[in-house]
Amino acid sequence: DPLFVIDGVIRDKEAFDLLEPYEIDQMSFLKDAATASIYGSAAGNGVVLVTTKGGTKNQKPIFNYQGSYAFSKPTQELFADRWDAIDDLDYQNAVARFQGTPLPNGEEEYAYFRDNKINYNVNDYIWQNPWNTKHSLSVNGGTDKVKYYVMGSFLAEEGSYVSLANKKFSLRSNLSVDLTKYITMNVNLDANQSNDKRFYWPFSDDDDQAVYDLYRCTFNAMKTTPFYSYLDGTPANTITDYPIYQDYGSWQGWNPVDQVVGNRYLKTRRRNLNGIVSFNINLDFITKGLSTKVMASYLGH
């Protein structure tokens, strides 16, 4: 990764990813000898310089709202939707022929699934079209001595599987005050909180929201096997309080639907607070064009 410098402070990629597009004023990509001379070996992969927005002198408050809503859906048929229960019966018989064992499915089994139109598709229970919505409200302005910019934003999104959700709240406040003719104080505050929720998946790290392996595992869910039953034990075509755990080869007691919609889940809350205080000192009274800057920053997770 390149080196990320946000408002003059070296930050990590996570801090860069948390930036909202609305709060960025300027962004530059540097990779040359001069850059290396300033930032050293850490700039070997280049430097990304980001300056966030600030206020404008002698300007009345200007409010700006931006919002969006987006959703997506697959352009191709999902892999697990490409076969049905009859195809599973054919597959089981084909395996038996290859192994030289009696066929497990005869006309009675075929008639049962065909005539009753039974097809237990895992995607009917756990798949959804993902969506996200973003909203931000900002105000900026200033007087002849004070400039300010304040922005609050909200993001909510849900993934392709139910029980995959994320919410993020962000707040930024950039204040600049001319203390004297020669000294300007800048106070930048950046705070955000993200709330991630996903179903428990034992084969992914707790911080992994992708759960790629689940998509592959849904291929193994047989269309002939119900995922739930009613109290009396009869198969159910909907989610009930009685999940059925079937063996799938080496998988013992596996129910991909209940794994996603059941009461096993992970909730992760992350909070970040970044504060920067700096003083720009004009030393023109010593030598024309001479200036210096003193900066302190605080980062909390």
Spans of model-derived segments:
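Short acidic/polar hinge/loop motifs at secondary-structure boundaries
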Residues: P2, D7-A34
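Short, glycine-/polar-rich solvent-exposed loops and beta-turns at beta-strand/coil boundaries
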Residues: D17-Y22, Y39-G44, L164-N166, W201
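Outer-membrane beta-barrel transmembrane strands
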Residues: Q128-D144, S153-L155, Y248-H301
